[in-house]
Amino acid sequence: QGRILLKKPDAFLKELGDCYLMERDYEQMMPLFVRTLELNPGSIDNITVQLSFARSNDIVNSIDPVIEKTLKSLCQKTDYLPVFDELAVWYNLQIRNYLLALQHAVLLNNKSENKLHIFLNIALDAINNKAFDQATIAYQKILGKGKENNPFYLPARKGILTCRYEQLRQSPADRSDYLQIAGDCEKYMQEFGYTPTNIDILSLLAELYAYRLQRPDSADRLLDKAIRMPRLNSNTLSQLKSQRADLLTFMDNPWEATILYTQLEKANPNNDIGYEAKLKKAMLAYYAGDLLWAKAQFDVLKGATSKLISNDAIQMSHFIHMNYEAEGDNRDLEKMGRTEYLLYKQQFQEVLPRLDSLIGHCSPGISDYATLQKARSLCACFQDEEAAKLLSELKDRSEQVYIKAEALFQLAGLKRKQKELQQAKELYRLLVTDYSGSVYSIEAAKLYRDLEAGEQTEVNNL
């Protein structure tokens, strides 16, 4: 009625689109959003926010076919607007179709200037979802434009190094592969300097030295040099100190590590950096057999703002509480702590026999927990089939709810990695329905929805 009275057919596009969105009438909504973009391409962020909201509330998955049909119709036209390539990139990132996202990003950059950041967005999203080959292509598109007048050149140079490292970590790799990445990181630092803007590559190089190339002393010197660098912001300095404390723990120097963690706690009393330092310091106490002090720290951290930190604290507090003997012998519990320290230091050949001993001779509480740690060790050694078998047996036999829940969650993660998605989905469903009180139920629900959305996307693409 307002349009008729004003004699303006394009009036109230947003308002009408929002109304149809709330009514879930997506067939009526999309043409209004398309017209909005035609009149004002700068509203793309606004439109994608609305579409994200619609997708998150679309329980029957009726909006994706409408979006796909609309994009197909628009992009078949000869001279369609660049903003629709931008919309196509956004949508294909939602459904993780990185190749199609890259195609539209290329088209967009052929039509418009200053759109290289789109490739950066694709690369970061692809890395998060382990689509490393597509991430590499996206970075190469940026690097292909050269250094001159290219503000995304350095982020792409850094990103491609990180991408290569993360890709190697997914499966057994030769030392020579890690040496090559370390060499490229060293060349980058020589070319662009040991400055605060390049701390991320320095940090990556330290990780390569420490955990992949058996050169922890080189890593320690590098991190010490970084910490002394002038003009570091407080957050970066804290992250470097945390990385160095982790390294000192790995190098069997828990006392120096504890000093650094304590400094981090005091410098960050009410944020996740401080909470994480407190958690790691509590783990050091647990490794050393100071069980009651460690439990007291875990109890404090149950209310941490970070879900990951609070979940770890809850798990460790519960494990110690259930297995500590106030008037009895805690040698098995202390042995478990020492064994976990060896696991932290990646001494797998020594860890596995110790875990087998704990599994075979300890009470069910410690035996089941040791089985979880053995599964983690096997995964770290890329023995996924053996780990999956162990976890499957544990979830069936254990009488401890929190152990069963963790076994289910670990097993579901392995099934996802092995592309056995139906089994993973069923395991996540079990966590949500049968273990709703566990620390994993919320994350399991999210992962279940992701798998379901992925299935529907495959159906739509057929």
Model regions and ranges:
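Acidic, polar-rich low-complexity tracts and alpha-helical solenoid repeat scaffolds
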Residues: 1-462
